[in-house]
Structures are given as structure tokens and as C-alpha cells.
Amino acid sequence: MRILICYEESYRAYSDVLERAIGALRPEADVAACSLAEMGEQLESFNPHLVVSSRPNTVDPGARAAWYKLSPEPDEPSEACLGGRRWRTLNPPLEELLSFIDEVETLVRDGRELGGC
């Protein structure tokens, strides 16, 4: 499974920590990070199953299997989207993101065609 992490340059350290943590805790995943400015190019070349970003999908709406808008600010809501289903959460712990990754991986491994995010 491919996971792309995209944040503003001002949150580069946050992005790098997420990339390392997910890579260590989910070693079977191919994890990459980029800036928001590089997102469009990376979506095309890396073609991730899941995007974790500080922003909602405005680059290719509906074309991704899963998108997790993970706010770097604890008082701002985060939003998860999987197969078109969306839900919001406030200041989610890492375990919640890892559980979401596991759910995405199961659907990808089962070969289901996903979109809507």
C-alpha cells in the first residue's frame, strides 16, 4: 500500500515525523512525504492509495480511495474519507490514524475498486 503525506513547508518537521512513525509502525507500507506545492505531481507519479494531509482533496476530488485530512492544529477538526464515506474527529491520536491505515490496506489487499475521496 502506498501512503503520501503532504503538509505546508512550515509543518515539514510534522510531516517528517509522521512519515517515519508510519513507516516504522507499518513497514509493509510504502510511505513518502512532500510539500503541498508538490502534491499534484506526487499524486500522479506515486499514485497513493491513501493521502494524509493538512488539506482536503482539492487536487483530484473523488479520485482517491482514501484521504485523511489530519489537522496539525489540535483545535481544528480532522476529516477521514474512505470510499466516499466521511467523518470528522478532533485531535485524533496516532492509533486512530493507524487503524484507518489498516482499514484502507484491507480494502486495497482485497482488490476493491475505491474512489470517492
PLM ranges: what are they?
Residues L36-A37, S53-T58, P72-D75:
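Short, polar loop motifs at secondary-structure junctions
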Residues P27, Q42-V52:
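Proline-aspartate-enriched helix->loop->beta-strand connector
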Residues I22, R26, L43, I101-V108:
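Hydrophobic, Leu/Ile/Phe/Ala-enriched alpha-helical segments that form helix-helix packing faces
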Residues V17-I22, D60-A66:
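Short, aromatic/basic amphipathic alpha-helical patches
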Residues L43-S45, T58-A65, S78-C81:
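Short loop/helix-cap segments at secondary-structure boundaries that form the rim of catalytic
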Residues A66-C117:
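Ser/Thr/Gly-rich flexible loops in soluble cytosolic domains mediating phosphotransfer, phosphorylation
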Residues M1-L36:
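Short, charged N-terminal beta->alpha structural module
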